[in-house]
Amino acid sequence: MYKRQDVTLHQGELLCLLGGNGAGKTTLMQALAGFRKPYRGKVKLAKGQRLCMLPQNARSLFVADTVEKELLDSAEQDKAKAVQMAERLELTPLLARHPYDLSGGEIQRLAVGKLLLREATVLLLDEPTKGLDAYAKAELAQLLLALCREGASILVVTHDVEFAARYATGCALMFDGLLLSEGEPHAFFAGNRFYTTDANRIAAEHFPMDITCEEVIASCRSSLSAKEPEPPRG
């Protein structure tokens, strides 16, 4: 159950919704997608926007025996659109493969491509980084950020705090059906003791606003450079 929620997803935003198991994240997403009907309240979608949801098991979207047929199905048999999407998502070499034979990252790209071919402008993604290695996560993140720059709005339910810290434009935390906090990633993670990144937890005493390893390393280097003695003059 979720209680008295007021969530706004802005155009061009990549909002990561965090929280423990049973917090209500997936239930909220299903209500936004129309799969569950709330007892009270409304879900408002801006005029001209189309919402689609990617479930945690992305394979559940696949009904064909090749990647090409999956894209054609979502493109309503428009081959030009399917080919263009395959090129954009770097799926062209995989068109003859069965969707179940793809890697985790390739499965996510294909699933997102199917939603985009349905002309989705608001994407709800449930645990899209689950099971992905660091490279596949980075590839997925770059795709999502590119979509945001084009005007899409994306809500990601995730336990992956490192992914959220590195790529999200906004973060929110749910607990027991309540939205406890929301904000820009640096302010959000720096203000949390439990739901924060390893980098922030380790370096909080010295660099409280650093939330990624790269930021901590940069701050350490800057601090060391400032302490280096100036060379003697003359």
Q: Could you describe each region identified by the protein language model?
A:
Residues 158-159:
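H-loop/switch region of ABC-family ATPase nucleotide-binding domains
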Residues 98-102, 106:
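Conserved ABC ATPase signature
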Residues 3-4, 195-234:
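ABC ATPase nucleotide-binding domains
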Residues 123-126:
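Catalytic Walker B motif of ABC-type/P-loop ATPase nucleotide-binding domains
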Residues 133:
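ABC-family nucleotide-binding domains
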Residues 79-94:
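Conserved ABC ATPase "signature" region
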Residues 178-202:
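Conserved beta-strand-loop-alpha-helix hinge in the C-terminal portion
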